[in-house]
Swiss-Prot record:
Family: Belongs to the MCM family.
Protein's UniProt name: Probable DNA helicase MCM8
Matching CDD domains: MCM8, MCM8_WHD
Reaction it catalyzes: ATP + H2O = ADP + phosphate + H(+)
Positions that bind ATP: G403, D404, P405, G406, L407, G408, K409, S410
The EC number(s) this enzyme carries: 3.6.4.12
MCM domain ranges (all copies): 351-558
InterPro entries attached to this UniProt entry: AAA+_ATPase, MCM, MCM8/REC_WHD, MCM_dom, MCM_lid, MCM_OB, NA-bd_OB-fold, P-loop_NTPase
Taxonomic classification: Eukaryota, Viridiplantae, Streptophyta, Embryophyta, Tracheophyta
Organism of provenance: Arabidopsis thaliana
């Protein structure tokens, strides 16, 4: 069957005089000589002539004028097939392109070649490098990796996925000359698909030699690289126990080095098959598994979503809408945009509460924690990421949830990973350091080392949820760079590189011993370094405190989830909402004024009787749109509120031993305010945004800094608890006793000693009274204490005996 369905058009084939057979044939020979399975026939000449006619017309000339030189004399043309479809009138062209791309694409290359060099008025076709037409934006050929089967061999397909492995760039020999070992006759061989195949016998008359010497200086090479693409799994397509599908892709010439591990790419290419054992000589390995072949993609074009500029995305709205299925993360159909506009118009200022309660609706309460997760999903604005002359400022918001077992931390994390446009969920007790960052693996075929991306790199531009964070103490150090500098540096096996990891981290951890101890700091409860804890913008502590009303509501909510009705918020109908103090006793102190953020975020039993969560797929589109197109700026009034709160924190935090309140906390406040404005799709941060963020930060700090007596101690974000402070104070007192040869000290002397060592206690007088009650100090008179635990005091008491 010809290219035009039966081999002829409605008007019949053109006369040979109508086609410049000689000129077209010479160009076509340049493009199909590499493939010994193709031959120049009348169908190819006719198709090339039709393509020349299309590219010579006015719209076609505009496309051809976009040819780029890629260095080394090679040329490429990026051709949008949706645009080409509008100007092309060639019958059955796209059907044949899908079914026989290896026959159609060389004709397109030759047609562009002819039109371009006719404009340059040159006919030296043999002396110029080839022009490669890179076809993209063809949704009709898109297919998921799990559906790649033998039926697609030789067809044009488009796949979308994450790059997980990239090999080094190597030269691939396409042609080489050989000298006959007997008669010295020169023979030139073309290597199809890069397979080295010397001549079998000499072509000279009378010479039957089978020995040949390759002339390596005559070798013609092209750049060659292999990448491995892993499918992007959507939550709705999740299949239990199925390993994510991967496919090897071969990139050649100008396509090499277009992506790195972690990039999301759209690969358009031709499905091919390869037998790993076909050309391995010697012994039994030659026949081993000879019937088994492996599918791979010979790339025609690769589109990297990270490297696409903004004007490319907005150049043709109709084409970008049609590729919504292929580039699910960064493209929006007309229906998506209509939903975003209607959702914002319908709920207005209530958008934050609606989205917040759509995050894991099966978990009752925890509004402030859900608010922090929601802000982390939207993220702040990243600045100076591409400017090498400035220090990049991260926009990702990191959250850690610490608490007693059984409070729904893991479910919150899984829900966040499912809602995020690009989310990965990992469990700490089954994760290695390399699995989190990047691994260097050895390719069994080439013996080369290559990078294999870990969770933080694969989640670049999205969210990485790490459960059981306390079980992976040895891997904590690997996260320090990724969480602040937004990249992962690796130096292994002679490979030194830095990979992007612009990822928000939401972690969940259980305290040491199974129950959170208020008498200890967060660091001591988690056995986590202060450096890592300070990188989290928000630290939430969930405690399992008995509360009759809250327990009734939670139990009612859980029972309804297992009932036949399946309602998501039935507790609202039977009970009135609890006040701010019911879920956490500490909230009452901070929100005595009544109109707190927590009370505004709660669902009301009367107004929200018909509340239904936003579906995850629509929520993903809304979040993706906000992250890509909304970049809020700080207003003057909002900036003043955030600055005042930060300066107030600095005033309270004066102890030398605690983790200091630094500019990192100020940047956290700015990021949270940007995320709060993004939720409402606003380009300016308002005063209300700043107040909401300050309140969320207060909740986080209040939980982190409160001690076992309910006293807020601004030194408890890190460092030591009061038990360790007491030991430190008594040790210093013992040294002072030995130095001065006395065991009685006045209160003023103890004050000066406490100042000298930077003692972190809320009240020094109460602290001394507690030591007196515990028997470490003995009150000898007004404002005088004897140190009973010092070695000097013990030696004096033994002498008196």
């Amino acid at each position: 069957m010809g290219f035009y369905g039966g081999g002829s058009m409605a008007s019949g084939r053109p006369e040979s005089t109508g086609i410049d057979s000689l000129g077209i044939g010479k160009i076509l020979a340049v493009y199909i000589k590499d493939n010994e399975n193709l031959a120049i026939d009348e169908d190819k000449l006719q198709l090339t002539a039709e393509l020349i006619r299309v590219f010579s017309a006015s719209p076609g000339r505009d496309i051809v004028s976009q040819v780029n030189e890629d260095g080394g004399g090679s040329f490429s043309l990026s051709l949008d097939l949706q645009q080409f479809k509008k100007i092309s009138d060639i019958e059955n062209f796209f059907i044949n392109l899908e079914d026989n791309p290896k026959g159609v694409i060389p004709c397109m290359n030759a047609a562009v070649h002819k039109v371009l060099f006719d404009q340059w008025e040159t006919n030296e076709f043999e002396n110029v490098m080839k022009i490669n037409v890179r076809l993209h934006n063809y949704p009709e050929s898109s297919i998921s990796l799990k559906n790649l089967r033998a039926a697609y061999i030789g067809k044009l397909v488009t796949v979308h996925g994450t790059v997980v492995k990239v090999s080094t760039v190597k030269p691939l020999v396409t042609q080489m000359a050989f000298d006959c070992g007997k008669c010295k006759t020169g023979i030139t061989r073309e290597f199809t698909d890069g397979k080295f195949s010397p001549p079998l016998k000499c072509d000279s008359h009378g010479c039957k030699s089978k020995t040949f010497t390759p002339i390596r200086s005559s070798a013609q090479t092209i750049d060659f690289q292999k990448i491995r693409v892993q499918e992007l799994q959507k939550p709705e397509d999740h299949e239990e126990g199925r390993v994510p599908r991967t496919v090897e892709c071969e990139l050649m010439e100008d396509l090499v080095d277009i992506c790195i591990p972690g990039d999301v790419v759209t690969v358009t290419g031709i499905i091919g098959v390869i037998n790993n054992y076909m050309d391995i000589g010697g012994g039994k390995s030659k026949t081993k598994n000879q019937g088994f072949y492996y599918l791979f993609i010979e790339a025609v074009s690769v589109k990297n979503t990270k490297r696409q500029s903004a004007f490319e995305n907005s150049e043709d709205s109709s084409s970008s809408a049609q590729t919504a299925d292929v580039g699910d993360l960064y493209s929006f159909s007309q229906r998506d945009l209509e939903f975003i506009v209607k959702f914002k118009e319908e709920y207005g200022s209530d958008t934050f509460r609606r989205i917040l309660h759509s995050v894991c609706p099966s978990i009752y309460g925890h509004e402030i924690v859900k608010a922090g997760i929601t802000l982390s999903l939207f993220g702040g604005v990243r600045k100076h990421s591409m400017d090498r002359n400035k220090v990049p400022v991260r926009g990702d918001i990191h959250v850690i949830i610490v608490g007693d077992p059984g409070l729904g931390k893991s479910q919150l994390l899984q829900a966040a990973a499912a809602i995020s446009p690009r989310g990965i969920y990992v469990c700490g007790n089954a994760t290695t350091r390399a699995g989190l960052t990047v691994a260097v693996v050895k390719d069994s075929m080439t013996n080369d080392y290559a990078f294999e991306a870990g969770a933080m790199v694969l989640a670049d531009g999205g969210l990485c949820c790490i459960d059981e964070f306390d079980k992976m103490t040895t891997e904590h150090q690997a996260l320090l760079e990724a969480m602040e500098q937004q990249c992962v540096s690796v130096a292994k096996a002679g490979l030194v590189a830095s990979l992007s990891a612009r990822t928000s981290v939401i972690a969940a951890a259980n305290p040491v011993g199974g129950h959170y101890n208020r008498a200890k700091t967060v660091n001591e409860n988690l056995k986590m370094s202060a450096a890592l804890l300070s990188r989290f913008d928000l630290v939430f502590i969930l405690l399992d405190k008995p509360d009759e009303l809250l327990d009734k509501q939670v139990s009612e909510h859980i029972m309804s989830l297992h009932s036949a009705s399946g309602e998501t918020s039935p507790a609202l109908k039977k009970f009135k909402p609890v006040n701010a103090a019911s879920q956490n006793a500490g909230y009452a102190n901070m929100h005595a004024e009544g109109n707190s953020l927590l009370s505004r975020l709660r669902l009301d039993s009367e107004k929200d009787d018909d509340f239904s969560p936003v579906p995850g797929q629509l929520l993903r589109k809304y979040i993706s749109y906000a992250r890509n197109f909304v970049n809020p700026k700080m207003s003057k009034d909002a900036g003043e509120i955030i600055q005042k709160f930060y300066l107030k924190l600095r005033d309270h935090n004066t102890s030398a031993d605690s983790t200091p309140i630094t500019a990192r906390q100020l940047e956290s406040l700015v990021r949270l305010a940007q995320a709060r404005a993004r939720v409402d799709l606003r380009e300016e941060i308002t005063v209300q945004d700043a107040m909401d963020v300050v309140e969320i930060m207060k909740e986080s700090l209040y939980d982190k800094l409160i001690d076992e007596h309910g006293v807020v101690d601004f030194g408890r974000s890190g460092g030591m608890s009061q038990q360790k402070e007491a030991k430190r104070f008594l040790s210093a007192l013992d040294k002072q006793s030995e130095l001065q040869q006395k065991d009685c000290f006045s209160v003023s002397e103890m004050y000066s000693l406490a100042d000298r060592i930077g003692l972190r206690v809320p009240d020094i007088d109460t602290f001394l009274e507690n030591l007196n009650i515990a028997g470490y100090l003995l009150k000898k008179g007004p404002k005088t204490y004897q140190v009973l635990s010092s070695s000097y005091s013990r030696s004096q008491s033994s002498r008196s005996r």
